[in-house]
């Protein structure tokens, strides 16, 4: 037990780090952002898949308007939309053709303004996705930049008459051999085929030429590398502000910025990208106070020092939370903390096929997984607590949902969402509140699948009811954006998948079976995952200890990593969260840990009471918690 006490005291002592500037940080002190971020949950909506109002098979703004009462019922503070702007639709809207106009498939600018007004009437903020780093190759800026004689836009992009090295040549040669090379991410350069120079610099797909924000320490032997203060990069920076201002003037409350850390090239110490975003933040604070900038960065010490209000804990391959959710590399090399088997090594992929033995990590333990994440997360939160917030996501459009593989029952998902929704600032991906599943073998719609990574399975239509297309659209199933929860039929499926199919799976031809994963089937069921989600969000609003600016204090036991236990406190109130995602009962005594916590913080005020519980969980807490027992797949939230 002594090890646990020491861990808590070290975390408490770490609070002094909050006042220290982060590495590469700035002397400017940023406000953390508007008050709604403190107790808020942000709801992410992939607009093509949420609700179709006109029967064409693609979700739209008027469809979202029709479901604002439902979104309000969740208790969320804001909606974040994936890109709504006019797009070439090679990469799900992230190849923008016009930043100033809503794509006609979603409606009009006036429709979006109406949505914003009606959302505001319900106390819900609206945030848009800003693709700041690149455009579509069909964007007028790029087409004019590609002309020999154009002057205004000639340096909005990065052009060269030669490739920088052999590797770039090999990458381009390999990419062009791909029949679908426009959706190939290999390398950084693309053959232009335009009147001017032979090659342009791309960010992701070939259809996404990088905007020119300049290079840090440009190489004089590389004439395409302009400094950040060259006329082209300065003009692009002004365009960025103009786009933000245009939508703020229409009522938008903030932006989530795509690839926020990579706008300036060759910026290893992030000095220039921090300067860029500080300039934007100072301009925004002066002209549009109380608006929010949220980044896809994954490093809050840099992100928040750059002036962002929120950074996101990413579920990417190297993300620290991936070991808790999905394993390090798409369930390829070890165990998963939030699993029935207690973090045993993953031996199969998502299709149920066995992994080769040499790819299975049999050395990493659940304690290793949890300790790694606790160390990372507490450092991120404590060292940036004066600057902004670090958000925890349930899933998103690029990564797996939490309902994946053998983690597929409502009970398991309640435990998972208990973790996410008691963290400092949660972002809830649409459909996760009802347990929608990550699917495989989905069609590659609009660049969703690339390099062996299937993103389409997390973008399937919202499942509203048991009607045609799960209530998403009245269209023919042949015209739907993505299939609605098709039957799970791969060979060698897990037994859990077969059980899931029988109990939860959708039927064929765009219909859903009674009792399936839908809003309709869960709305009035007090024991449903949907209502558990609502209860957790309501609990956040009622208890300041769970707010974004309250402390997160892990209780770690190397010999007994289950149940997961942590404290949230605001100095006035303290809440203990204990979660057991495994198939076995788990017991833990916390008397010495709680005593240490009380001594250091005076954080336990008496009136100990359970606030929420799922599964079979019991405790004995008076002056301390000397007996905490959690049955299989259970969790409890206790006010201390």
Predicted features and spans:
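Alpha-helical packing segments of well-folded alpha/beta enzyme cores
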Residues: 67, 111, 115, 236-247, ...
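Hydrophobic h-region of N-terminal signal peptides that target proteins for export
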Residues: 11-18
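Beta-strand-rich binding/interaction modules
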Residues: 585-614
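Acidic/aromatic-lined carbohydrate-recognition and catalytic surfaces
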Residues: 20-238, 249, 256, 260-309, ...
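Loop/helix patches that line or flank the sugar-binding groove of alpha-linked glycan CAZymes
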Residues: 37, 287, 307, 345-349, ...
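C-terminal beta-strand-rich structural cap/linker in extracellular carbohydrate-active enzymes
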Residues: 621-640
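Positively charged n-region of N-terminal signal peptides that target proteins for export
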Residues: 1-4
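Conserved alpha/beta catalytic core and glycan-binding cleft of carbohydrate-active enzymes
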Residues: 137-178, 277, 281-461, 466-469
């Amino acid at each position: 037990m002594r090890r646990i006490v020491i861990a808590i005291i070290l975390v408490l002592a770490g609070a002094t780090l909050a006042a220290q500037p982060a590495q590469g940080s700035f002397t400017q002190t940023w406000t953390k952002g508007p008050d709604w971020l403190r107790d808020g949950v942000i709801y992410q909506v992939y607009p093509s898949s949420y609700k179709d109002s006109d029967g064409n098979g693609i979700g739209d703004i008027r469809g979202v308007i029709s479901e604002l009462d439902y979104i309000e019922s969740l208790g969320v503070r804001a909606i974040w939309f994936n890109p709504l702007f006019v797009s070439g639709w090679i990469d799900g809207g992230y190849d923008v053709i016009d930043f100033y106009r809503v794509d006609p498939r979603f409606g009009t600018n006036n429709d979006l303004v109406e949505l914003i007004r009606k959302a505001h009437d319900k106390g819900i903020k609206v945030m848009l996705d800003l693709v700041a780093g690149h455009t579509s190759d069909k964007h007028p800026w790029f087409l004019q930049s590609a002309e020999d004689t154009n002057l205004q836009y000639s340096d909005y992009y990065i052009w060269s008459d030669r490739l920088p090295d052999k590797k770039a040549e090999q990458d381009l040669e390999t990419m062009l051999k791909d029949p679908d090379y426009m959706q190939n991410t290999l390398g950084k350069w693309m053959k232009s085929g335009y009147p001017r120079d032979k090659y342009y610099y791309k960010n992701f797909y070939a259809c996404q030429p990088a905007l020119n924000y300049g290079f840090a320490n440009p190489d004089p032997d590389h004439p395409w590398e302009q400094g950040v203060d060259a006329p082209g990069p300065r003009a692009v920076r002004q365009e960025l502000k103009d786009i933000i201002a245009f939508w703020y003037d229409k009522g938008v409350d903030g932006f989530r910025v795509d690839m926020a850390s990579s706008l300036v090239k060759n910026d290893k110490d992030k000095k220039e990208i921090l300067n860029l975003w500080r300039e934007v933040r100072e301009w925004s604070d002066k002209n549009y106070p109380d608006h929010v900038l949220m980044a896809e960065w994954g490093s809050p010490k840099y992100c928040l020092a750059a002036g962002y209000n929120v950074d996101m804990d990413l579920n990417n391959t190297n993300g620290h939370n991936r070991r808790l959710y999905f394993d390090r590399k798409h369930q390829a090399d070890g165990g998963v903390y939030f699993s029935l088997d207690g973090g045993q090594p993953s031996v199969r992929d998502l299709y149920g096929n066995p992994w080769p033995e040499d790819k299975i990590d049999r050395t990493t333990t659940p304690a290793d997984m949890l300790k790694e994440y606790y160390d990372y997360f507490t450092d991120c939160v404590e060292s940036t607590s004066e600057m902004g917030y670090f958000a925890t996501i349930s899933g998103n459009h690029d990564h797996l949902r939490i309902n994946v593989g053998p983690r597929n029952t409502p009970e398991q998902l309640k435990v998972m969402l208990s973790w996410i929704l008691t963290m400092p600032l949660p972002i809830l991906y649409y459909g996760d509140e009802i347990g929608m599943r990550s699917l495989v073998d989905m069609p590659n719609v609009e660049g969703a699948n690339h390099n062996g990574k299937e993103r389409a399975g997390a973008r399937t239509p919202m499942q509203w009811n048991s009607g045609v297309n799960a209530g998403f659209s009245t269209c023919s199933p042949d015209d739907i954006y993505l299939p609605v929860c098709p039957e799970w039929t791969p060979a060698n499926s897990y037994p859990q998948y077969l059980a899931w199919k029988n109990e939860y799976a959708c039927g064929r031809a765009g219909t859903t079976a009674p009792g399936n994963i839908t809003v309709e089937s869960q709305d009035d069921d007090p024991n449903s995952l949907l209502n558990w989600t609502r209860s957790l969000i309501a609990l956040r609003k009622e208890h300041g200890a769970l707010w974004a600016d309250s402390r997160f204090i892990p209780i770690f036991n190397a010999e007994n990593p289950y149940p997961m236990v942590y404290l949230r406190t605001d100095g006035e109130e303290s809440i203990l969260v204990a979660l057991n995602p495994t198939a076995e009962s788990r017991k833990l005594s916390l008397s010495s840990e709680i005593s240490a916590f009380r001594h250091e913080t005076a954080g336990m005020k008496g009136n100990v009471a359970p606030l929420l519980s799922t599964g079979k969980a019991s405790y004995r807490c008076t002056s301390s918690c000397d007996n905490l027992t959690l049955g299989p797949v259970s969790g409890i939230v206790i006010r201390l």
